[in-house]
Design a protein with these regions (language model features):
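N-terminal signal-anchor transmembrane alpha helix
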Residues: 16-44, 193-198
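Extracytosolic (periplasmic/ER-lumenal) interhelical loops and adjacent juxtamembrane/interface segments
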Residues: 41-77
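Hydrophobic cores of alpha-helical transmembrane segments in multi-pass inner/ER membrane proteins
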Residues: 2-3, 84-90, 142-160, 189-192
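Membrane-interfacial, low-structure loops and terminal tails that flank and connect transmembrane helices
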Residues: 2-15, 160-180
Length: 207
């Protein structure tokens, strides 16, 4: 039954969709990481400088970048790690796009890697929202991008049955994916995040 659910045309379309999302949003994440890294050096020279991403009282990169949470490992700005990780994701996206056959161990490591990135991005979002009390626009870009990338990679690995599900379970997973159930879940997550931000700051987000 799984073979009937995995139509070659659908598989090709799915891989193209996954690859496109990975390349596009990893590129956006790389841009955000680069800008934040440049801004980090700017702040070192002048801690009172005003950056372009200081939009209002609720959306302010500088206030977030001045906190310990912006440098959680060895005093290195978090954005530096993004500049190392996102090119890897872009490369993997290209590999999927050209039809490369990725080994199981590689796909498993890829899943664990994006899970780690998602966990960090979500932690930074909630910490900024409820502890720091200010949101960083570029950080929000990374959070959105990592959520979409994680969803895309998970979709890819589920279709590839990287985790060796039994046939009945795998059939159900394929039906769920074919019905775009996973896309609905991740879209809902992003809507919830937007709602939480609005609930916290209200109209201040747009002032």
């Amino acid at each position: 039954m799984a073979k009937d659910l995995k139509k070659p045309k659908d598989e090709a379309k799915s891989k193209k969709w996954v690859a496109t999302l990975m390349i596009v949003f990893a590129s956006i994440g790389l841009l955000a990481s680069f800008v934040l890294s440049v801004d980090a050096f700017t702040l070192l020279k002048d801690s009172d400088t005003q950056l372009a991403c200081n939009l209002n009282a609720a959306l302010n990169c500088v206030e977030v970048m001045k906190t310990p949470q912006s440098e959680i490992l060895f005093g290195i700005p978090n954005s530096f790690f993004g500049m190392m990780a996102f090119p890897v994701l872009i490369t993997i996206g290209v590999m999927i796009a050209i039809g490369a056959r990725l080994p199981k161990w590689f796909k498993t490591c890829m899943q664990l890697g994006v899970l780690g990135g998602l966990a960090f991005a979500w932690w930074m979002f909630f910490d900024s929202l409820y502890v720091i009390g200010v949101l960083c626009p570029w950080c929000l870009t990374v959070t959105t991008g990592m959520t979409i990338i994680f969803g895309a990679v998970t979709h890819y690995n589920l279709r590839e049955n990287t985790f060796d599900f039994k046939r009945p379970t795998y059939d159900k997973i394929l039906k769920f994916l074919n019905a775009d159930g996973d896309k609905l879940i991740w879209a809902t997550v992003l809507v919830i995040f937007a709602f939480l931000a609005f609930a916290k700051f209200g109209i201040a987000l747009f002032e």
